Amino acid sequence: MADLAKIEEQLSSLTLMQAAELVKMLEEKWCVSAAAPVAVAAAGAAPAAEAVAEKTEFEIVLIAAGDKKVEVIKAVKDITGLGLIEAKKLVDEAPKLMKSNVKKAEAEEIKGKLEAAGAKVELK
C-alpha cells in the first residue's frame, strides 16, 4: 500500500502537460486508448439514431436582425440573391424561413455569415 500511496502522490504532482505525455506513453506501451468507451445503443433505439444522423438538408430560419439591421440586410441580399427591397422585407418579417433544402456545410457557412452580421439564425 505504501508504494501505491507514493505513486498517487507523484501523479498528483504532475502538471497537465506531463500527465498528457504520460497518458500517451502508456497508450503506446500497452497498445490501448484512453478514449471513453462508446455505449452501444439498444436495438429499439437504433432506427431513431440513424434518422437523426442521416439528416443532410436543413432550413435556415432568420430569427431576428439584431442591432446591426443594415449589415444583416446586406448579408441576406448577398446570400439569397434577392434585391435590396426584398432582402429588407425578409429581414423585417423575421422570424422567417430564408432558405430550405440546404446541405449541412452550406447551412453552417450561411449561419456563420448571418451571425457575423449580427443576426440570430436557427437551422432546422
UniProtKB/Swiss-Prot annotation:
Keyword flag Glycoprotein: no
The keyword NAD appears for this protein: no
Cellular component, GO, one term: ribonucleoprotein complex
Signal peptide positions on this chain: none
One Pfam family of this chain: Ribosomal_L12_N
Biological processes, Gene Ontology terms: translation
GO molecular function: mRNA binding; structural constituent of ribosome
InterPro entries registered for this protein in UniProt: Ribosomal_bL12, Ribosomal_bL12_C, Ribosomal_bL12_C/ClpS-like, Ribosomal_bL12_oligo, Ribosomal_bL12_oligo_N_sf
Keyword annotations of the record: Ribonucleoprotein, Ribosomal protein
Family listed: Belongs to the bacterial ribosomal protein bL12 family.
NCBIfam families: L12
Stated role: Forms part of the ribosomal stalk which helps the ribosome interact with GTP-bound translation factors. Is thus essential for accurate translation.
Subunit annotation: Homodimer. Part of the ribosomal stalk of the 50S ribosomal subunit. Forms a multimeric L10(L12)X complex, where L10 forms an elongated spine to which 2 to 4 L12 dimers bind in a sequential fashion. Binds GTP-bound translation factors.
Full protein name: Large ribosomal subunit protein bL12
Species this chain originates from: Rickettsia akari (strain Hartford)
Taxonomic path: Bacteria, Pseudomonadati, Pseudomonadota, Alphaproteobacteria, Rickettsiales
